[in-house]
């Protein structure tokens, strides 16, 4: 059974990690890529070694956010974190070797299957980017690069703020990201 963590507990746990590999889902969208890129940059700001597992399905739209974070082929992680992934069947093929090693899942899907040792879930969030924003700002300063990645995450999963899942909280987070 996965331990449920609050945002604060998640940030505290992330501070204990190093050599982190971050996983995104198949057919990666802006939410999974933006969250992974933001988390990677936040961990690096703390002096941690962190990378994203290269996702073979990424499109040219999202590649610029992810490319600076891609893991080198010889990287051996000490910790594996998934973002915006509700179930293991959403992992790309190259992530399957890590499916039993995921120490933390950060997500917003009510269908979350709690496959990781720990899970930070906010099923009321319109995007995983909302959850990640709260975690990152608890961890470190939100830099312009982090803000841009999180804005991509939030705007993507809300259909540029027109989907019914968009809330006042969504707009407050987007505004805060724009102010960085």
Regions found by a protein language model. Give the residues of each.
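A structured phosphate/pyrophosphate-recognition subdomain
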Residues: 2-26, 38-44, 113-180
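Active-site cofactor/cluster-binding pocket
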Residues: 63-118
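General alpha-helical segment detector with a strong preference for membrane-spanning helices
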Residues: 33-35, 88, 111, 161
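Anionic-ligand anchoring segments at beta-strand to alpha-helix junctions in alpha/beta enzyme folds, i.e.
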Residues: 17-78
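Short, glycine- and charge-enriched coil/turn segments that flank and shape catalytic ligand pockets
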Residues: 47-49, 95, 99, 138-142
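Short, surface-exposed, polar/charged, turn-prone segments marking secondary-structure boundaries
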Residues: 49-52, 78-80, 108-111, 130-134
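Hydrophobic/aromatic residues located in beta-strands of well-ordered beta-sheets
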Residues: 50-52, 103, 150
């Amino acid at each position: 059974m996965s331990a449920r963590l609050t945002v604060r507990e998640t940030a505290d746990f992330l501070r204990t990690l190093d050599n982190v590999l971050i996983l995104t889902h198949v057919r990666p969208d802006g939410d999974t890529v933006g969250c992974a890129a933001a988390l990677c940059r936040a961990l690096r700001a703390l002096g941690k070694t962190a990378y994203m597992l290269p996702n073979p399905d990424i499109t040219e739209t999202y590649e610029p956010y992810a490319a600076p974070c891609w893991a080198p082929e010889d990287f051996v992680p000490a910790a594996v974190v998934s973002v915006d992934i509700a179930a293991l069947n959403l992992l790309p093929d190259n992530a399957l070797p890590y499916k039993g090693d995921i120490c933390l899942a950060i997500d917003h899907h009510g269908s979350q299957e709690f496959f990781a040792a720990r899970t930070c879930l906010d099923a009321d969030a319109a995007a995983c980017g909302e959850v990640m924003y709260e975690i990152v700002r608890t961890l470190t300063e939100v830099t312009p690069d982090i803000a841009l990645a999180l804005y991509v995450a939030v705007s993507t999963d809300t259909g540029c703020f027109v989907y019914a899942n968009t809330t006042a909280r969504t707009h407050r987070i987007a505004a805060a990201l724009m102010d960085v």
